[in-house]
C-alpha cells in the first residue's frame, strides 16, 4: 500500500477516511470555575457544539432550526451522558484513491458498533469498536443481524438527507 500522510496508530487509517484514524479526534474544553477537570468517553460530533453552547448559556434550542446535534452539557458537568442509542453518520461520496486512499462510503456508528458501506464496491464492513479499536476484525459475516440493522439505518439516513452516491 501507499504511505499515509498521517498515522493515528493504533487506530486504522488517517485523514480523509471514515475509519477511526480519520474521524476520531480529541476535544478539550476549558471554562474556569464552571467545568471540572476530567476525562469523558462521550461520543461528540462537530454538530453538537452549537446546541451545547446554547445549553450552557441557558438559551433554548429551536427544534425547527437546530436539526443536527445534541448538547453534551451533562458530560461537561461531570454527569453521565448515555449516547449509545444515538446513531452518528458520516458520508464521503468523493473517493480519493490516489491522495488519501479512501473510497466513497457512508458510515454509521451506533453504540460500540460501526458499519461502513462502500456502496460503489458493493462491500460492507462491521466493527465492534470496544473490542477492536483498530478496525481489523470485520464482523459483517459473523453478525449478519447487526450488519443488516445498521445497513438499513444507513440506507434510510442517506435517503432522508438526499445524499449523493
Regions found by a protein language model. Name each.
Residues 132:
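Intrinsically disordered, low-complexity polar regions and short flexible loop motifs
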Residues 55, 78, 142, 153-156:
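Residues within well-ordered alpha-helical secondary structure of globular protein domains
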Residues 84, 146-148:
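Cytochrome P450 catalytic domain signature, combining two hallmark sequence patches
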Residues 27-29:
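Short glycine- and hydrophobic/aromatic-rich loop-to-beta-strand nucleating segment
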Residues 137-145:
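Active-site-proximal N-terminal segment of extracellular/periplasmic enzymes that hydrolyze or transfer
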Residues 149-165:
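Charge-dense polyanion-binding interfaces
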Amino acid at each position: 500500500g501507499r504511505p499515509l500522510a498521517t498515522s493515528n496508530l493504533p487506530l486504522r487509517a488517517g485523514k480523509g477516511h471514515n475509519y477511526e484514524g480519520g474521524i476520531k479526534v480529541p476535544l478539550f474544553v476549558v471554562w474556569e470555575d464552571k467545568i471540572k477537570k476530567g476525562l469523558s468517553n462521550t461520543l461528540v460530533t462537530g454538530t453538537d457544539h452549537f446546541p451545547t453552547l446554547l445549553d450552557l448559556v441557558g438559551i433554548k434550542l429551536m427544534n425547527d432550526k437546530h436539526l443536527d446535534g445534541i448538547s453534551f452539557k451533562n458530560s461537561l458537568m461531570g454527569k453521565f451522558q448515555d449516547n449509545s442509542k444515538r446513531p452518528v453518520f458520516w458520508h464521503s461520496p468523493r473517493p480519493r484513491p490516489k491522495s488519501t486512499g479512501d473510497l466513497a462510503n457512508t458510515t454509521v456508528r451506533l453504540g460500540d458498533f460501526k458499519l461502513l458501506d462502500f456502496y460503489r464496491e458493493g462491500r460492507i464492513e462491521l466493527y465492534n469498536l470496544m473490542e477492536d479499536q483498530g478496525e481489523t476484525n470485520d464482523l459483517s459475516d459473523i453478525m449478519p443481524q447487526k450488519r443488516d440493522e445498521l445497513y438499513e439505518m444507513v440506507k434510510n439516513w442517506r435517503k432522508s438527507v438526499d445524499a449523493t452516491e
